[in-house]
Amino acid sequence: MSQWRITADFSDDGNPITSNWELADTDGYGSLGSNMTESSGVFTFPATGIYFIQFITSHTADNIDGLLQIQVETTTNGTNFGGASEQMCGISRASDANTFVTSFVFDVTNVSTHKCRFVVASVSSDTTTHGHSSQNETHATFIKLGDT
């Protein structure tokens, strides 16, 4: 099990989110087993198995009716990513803080080809996705449930 987070805010799109990822390092953080690895927003699994992936995002919008799409994207060939789980999210009032969640259970049969990444697609302008370097705001959790 491991958690990764975005360390800085970004505006509008992160399609996909390619930068500012870090392994959680807050005091008391615990992981179990080997950690995921990340390069340019693409996550590699440490071993084959069935994994629960959860993506939690934190947002504000400067205008009313901010609309976002968040996704877990996966690939089984190492190249072509597609949406495995998505959530359409509305922000109904300017400056409201919102948290959204999507998740997916991924059968990783080959660690060289089975990978994932995360998307925040802003349909409306003036939305901010929040990150932080010392606590989890926008973050991903990976839990190995068992063998494939």
How would you describe each model-predicted region?
Residues A24-D25, Q87-G90, S112-R117:
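N-terminal start-of-chain detector that recognizes signal peptides
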Residues D12, G83, F106-V108, V120, ...:
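Generic detector of N-terminal low-structure segments
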